[in-house]
Amino acid sequence: MISRTTRRFREALAGLPQDVRRQARSAYRLFRDNPRHPSLQFKRVHPSLPIYSARISGDYRAVGSFSGDTVVWFFVGSHADYDRLLRAL
């Protein structure tokens, strides 16, 4: 599976605390090696669009659009911001 990131994702990631950035890198490596790893809780989060989320930590999530064998990650942030994003989709 191929992962890509948007500029907005990279900017949001850069603005997160260092420990969360470290957790995000760890989650990415895990996703790269095994996208179905239970700790990632990788799942579809929209009923009609191919939008998926992955768990970074108990408090942070990443969200991406899935097409073919590629995920384009466009959001990374707190669970509260994640919940707001999902309501807006």
Predicted regions and their residues:
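Enriched for short, Lys/Arg-rich terminal
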Residues: 2-4, 56-89
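Non-catalytic, surface-exposed connector residues within folded enzymatic/regulatory domains
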Residues: 3, 25, 36-39, 76
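A short, surface-exposed loop/turn module that caps and links secondary-structure elements
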Residues: 29-54
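Arg/Lys-rich, positively charged N-terminal/basic patches that mediate binding to nucleic acids
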Residues: 1-27
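Tryptophan-centered motif/residue detector
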Residues: 10, 28, 42, 73-75
